[in-house]
Amino acid sequence: MLNPDGVIIGNFRTSYSGKDLNRQFFTADKLVYPEICALNELALQLKQQYKNRFEYYFDLHSHSTRTGLFCYGPEHQIWSGYYLRCRAFAKLLERSDEMFSYRSSIFTISEHKKTTGRAKMFSGLHIPYTYTFELSNGFYQTVGEKLVPLDEFDMLRAGRVILEGFYSFEKVHRASMTVLHTAAIGNSRRADLSRTTPLKKRSMVRPTSKA
């Protein structure tokens, strides 16, 4: 929890300083926002240590006006391979539990969210799968559009949905990467063979003409 003082004194989204912590990731003052600076430093250390293997960043929030569990995802360009993959992860979550709403999820970083943790990890550290998960303070909507009140057990359920979905997605993702890698190696070997195998010389003997 990055905002224990704000939670303890009953603030909705601000710390004891009265500022929204999730809008301070690019300009954080170490004296005023020590927790944000610490998280930025940790993320940078992990990126330096694991490089491109540091692929995921999740943060969890509550939402006062929308229903259910949904996410704000990364903003990849449509020609990027991540464009569909980051959406496939969210779609997998929806299929695993009706609490999660793919329709409510958004995969852009709007102007007023460009200083959030998600934006910092995506554009600053180039982490491809960056998500802010939002869980409603009140209800979630079933497939039949019935509103169901949320309780503390549903909060635990939401955490389980995210983690189990992440595990399932990683298995599929790794398997697909293995297949693509194997195919790429096969194509490379065939290309090497085609370059090293000599072509048969064409005969230079002219055919004799019939009398």
Roles of regions detected by a PLM:
Residues M1-A211:
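Structured catalytic-domain cores with a bias toward divalent-metal coordination
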